[in-house]
Amino acid sequence: MEAFDTHTGIGVPLRRSNVDTDQIIPAVYLKRVTRTGFEDGLFAGWRTDPSFILNLEPFNRGTVLVAGPEFGTGSSREHAVWALMDYGFRVVLSSRFGDIFRGNAGKAGLVAGLVGQSDIELLWKLIEQNPGLELTVNLEDRTVTAGTAVVPFEIDDYTRWRLLEGLDDIGLTLRKVDEIAAFEAARPEFKPRTLEPSE
């Protein structure tokens, strides 16, 4: 997973609340067995509307999604996070996330920053008045800068650390390879063990 420190990208105002994971990526797009290639399914039900925000310049090149409250609720599909990332989003800001979505985001490398609703509305206003406005998200300081406005966001310390270090679950496990090997070496012979792959 790529480490995240600071990201600057075009802000996208998604003025919708209660966006569940089925709206983020409908179930019909979940047939792949890989983690990539889901960008076409992102908001598929809405992208048929020519006036949908991601169909408009310059928002179709956005990388910071500023969403309404209750973003990512519903089923626990990781594909919702993968679709956002495949499209190009690095950050999603909302005043409230579905808990499972927020956890999946952090594990995959997508920043899900909690921002007060009044600050979300300020960001919407600034972006809509200045299409193409770039937002800078600083994970170290937990701030979002839009022009001269600076707003704070919340993210738990553990997820923040993982993102700053670029550690997904596999990366965390690989940090413990020596300890795992020492544990396996000390296991009694009569206990089950994982066999080395044969050549």
Swiss-Prot record:
Q: Which Gene3D superfamilies match?
A: Aconitase, domain 4
Keyword Amino-acid biosynthesis found: yes
Task: Identify the enzyme class.
Answer: lyase
Provide GO CC annotations from the record: 3-isopropylmalate dehydratase complex
Q: Which Pfam families match?
A: Aconitase_C (PF00694)
Keyword Lyase on this protein? yes
Which Gene Ontology terms describe the biological processes this protein takes part in? L-leucine biosynthetic process
- EC assignment: the record states 4.2.1.33
- Please give the pathway this protein is involved in: Amino-acid biosynthesis; L-leucine biosynthesis; L-leucine from 3-methyl-2-oxobutanoate: step 2/4
Which family is this sequence assigned to?
Belongs to the LeuD family. LeuD type 1 subfamily.
NCBIfam families (UniProt xref): leuD, PRK01641.1
Q: What does this protein do?
A: Catalyzes the isomerization between 2-isopropylmalate and 3-isopropylmalate, via the formation of 2-isopropylmaleate.
HAMAP family per UniProt: LeuD_type1
This one is known as 3-isopropylmalate dehydratase small subunit
* Primary gene name: leuD
